[in-house]
């Protein structure tokens, strides 16, 4: 009786651990009711300023301070002026199926240079330290971006695809221990 009860508990724990309950969205009736919803602007009403914000390589400036090492002098300059620097880059170069990390980072840097050409050339005349910190920041922001399919190529277990295999493995181990 004790082993049977332990097996039931093991089965319950396995089902809870490997079920996709966390990915299920709880949806009520509110998503069907469209009361007090604002009408989305038509594409003819979109201004050039709005279009410029979402083009690939555009800077995201929200005033956040990032944890990046720029060297002693660069760190002091960044600490004092971090609000002037971007804290993100709009870029999604994952549309190509076989893009590598190096190619992705290079195209992100190139797109950022094209999108922000005016700001990069204007600031270049003013301050060399600003330029050095900005370019290092751009390289860092592009290198931390990733494509989801890179994770699928990795050696780790894919959670969604390997759940049945893990469940079978646990049941097999349970039968061996039993």
Swiss-Prot record:
Comment, domains: A short helical region is required and sufficient for Cu(2+) binding.
Which species expresses this protein natively?
Answer: Ovis aries (Sheep)
Note down the stretches annotated as region Globular. Answer: 51-154
Tell me a GO cellular component. external side of plasma membrane
Instruction: Tell me which residues bear the GPI-anchor amidated glycine lipid modification.
Output: 154
Provide the disulphide bond pattern.
94-147, 108-142
Recite the UniProt keywords alphabetically. Amyloid, Cell membrane, Copper, Disulfide bond, Fertilization, Glycoprotein, GPI-anchor, Lipoprotein, Membrane, Metal-binding, Prion, Signal
Signal peptide residue numbers: 1-25
Keyword Ubl conjugation listed? no
**What's one GO MF term for it?**
copper ion binding
PTM: N-glycosylated.
Please list where the region (Flexible tail) is annotated: 27-50
For this entry, the protein name equals: Prion-like protein doppel
Q: Which residues lie in the propeptide?
A: 155-178
- Principal location: membrane
User: Glycosylated where?
Assistant: 98, 110
- List the top taxonomic levels of the source: Eukaryota, Metazoa, Chordata, Craniata, Vertebrata
- What does the record say about tissue specificity? Strongly expressed in testis. Detected at low levels in lymph node, spleen and ovary.
